[in-house]
C-alpha cells in the first residue's frame, strides 16, 4: 500500500489545485535561482558546458552539471519529505505538501551554498574540490527531490524504502559517500570515515 492510498480526506482549506501548486513550485525555483545568483553562484559550470551527467566526484566539475552521484541523495530527500509531510500534515493535500517540501529543499540549497557550509564540507569531508553548486545544478537537485516526492506518492511504501536503501548502498560502495555519510560528516566528521572515503571505488 502506498502512502497516497492511505491519505485521509483533505479539508477544502488545505486543498490546492495541481496547476496552482505547479505555479508556486516554479516560482520557488525561480526565487532559489535568483537568490543563488545574488550569493555569487555561477549560472553554469565555469568550464562553459552543461552536461546531463558528470560522474567524477573528485573534480572541479562535481555539483556543476545537471546530474551527478549526489542526485540520488536528493531523490531520497523527496522520499523523506513525502513521508515527513504525510505524517505531520496529513490533512493537507499532496500538492500543498509538495510546496512545503520544495521550500525545505530550496532552503537547504541556499544554506548548502553559503560560505560557512562550503568551508565545512571542504574541512570535514572528502569534498576538497567543492566550492559550491552552479545554479543549474542546484535547481536540478531540487527537481530531483520533487521527482522523489512524486515517486513516493505513487510507489508502495516497501518499494520506496527498498529504492532508498539500494541508492545508499550502491552509491556508497562506488563513490564512498552517500546521504547518510554526508550528514554524519557535516555534523561531526570522523577521521576513520574520512580515511575510508579516500579509497578507490569498491564496485
Curated annotation (Swiss-Prot):
<dbReference type="GO" id="GO:0005886">
    <property type="term" value="C:plasma membrane"/>
</dbReference>
<dbReference type="InterPro" id="IPR019691">
    <property type="entry name" value="DUF2585"/>
</dbReference>
<comment type="similarity">
    <text>Belongs to the UPF0314 family.</text>
</comment>
<keyword id="KW-0812">Transmembrane</keyword>
<feature type="transmembrane region" description="Helical">
    <location>
        <begin position="155"/>
        <end position="175"/>
    </location>
</feature>
<keyword id="KW-0472">Membrane</keyword>
<protein>
    <recommendedName>
        <fullName>UPF0314 protein Rpal_0309</fullName>
    </recommendedName>
</protein>
<keyword id="KW-1003">Cell membrane</keyword>
<feature type="transmembrane region" description="Helical">
    <location>
        <begin position="20"/>
        <end position="40"/>
    </location>
</feature>
<keyword id="KW-1133">Transmembrane helix</keyword>
<feature type="transmembrane region" description="Helical">
    <location>
        <begin position="69"/>
        <end position="89"/>
    </location>
</feature>
<dbReference type="Pfam" id="PF10755">
    <property type="entry name" value="DUF2585"/>
</dbReference>
